[in-house]
């Protein structure tokens, strides 16, 4: 009887060891969606119903651009600066719980982006070339 119990306990221990990393990966993926400090009220899906109440921060040389993402600064005179020292100030937008309004004509898929520079359309975390933004 002891022989039949021993393989079972080793099997369950082995399964636990194998499932633990899988569980940790699943939890990590779920947590990366939004941090507590910058999640909108009502969760990530409530973003569409929340109207931005303030203008996004100024950035770039002499403050001529606007923050359009965590490390993206764009303006008509400067184009888009991504991951540069001028765009570092845009990280501070994550500290605010209130969303900001990016100025510029709507563009992109389902008009979810804004024209932020000549020929450039940006959504929350990425920018692309768009002929509507000329």
From Swiss-Prot:
Keyword tags: Cleavage on pair of basic residues, Disulfide bond, Secreted, Signal
Any one GO CC term of the record: extracellular space
Gene3D superfamilies named among the record's database cross-references: Neurohypophysial hormone domain
SUPFAM superfamilies according to UniProt: Neurophysin II (SSF49606)
Signal peptide stretch: 1-33
Coiled-coil residue spans: none
Domain notes: The cysteine framework of the terepressin is C-C.
Name of this chain's protein: Terepressin/terephysin
């Amino acid at each position: 009887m002891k022989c039949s119990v021993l393989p079972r306990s080793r099997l369950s221990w082995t399964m636990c060891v194998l499932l633990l990393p899988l569980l940790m990966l699943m939890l990590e993926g779920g947590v990366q969606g939004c941090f507590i400090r910058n999640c909108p009220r009502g969760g990530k899906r409530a973003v569409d119903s929340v109207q931005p109440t303030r203008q996004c921060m100024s950035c770039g040389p002499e403050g001529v651009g606007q923050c359009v993402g965590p490390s993206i600064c764009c303006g008509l005179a400067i184009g888009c600066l991504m991951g540069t020292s001028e765009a570092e100030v845009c990280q501070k937008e994550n500290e605010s719980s209130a969303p900001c309004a990016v100025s510029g004509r709507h563009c992109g898929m389902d008009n979810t982006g804004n024209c932020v520079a000549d020929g450039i359309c940006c959504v929350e975390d990425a920018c692309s070339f768009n002929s509507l933004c000329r």
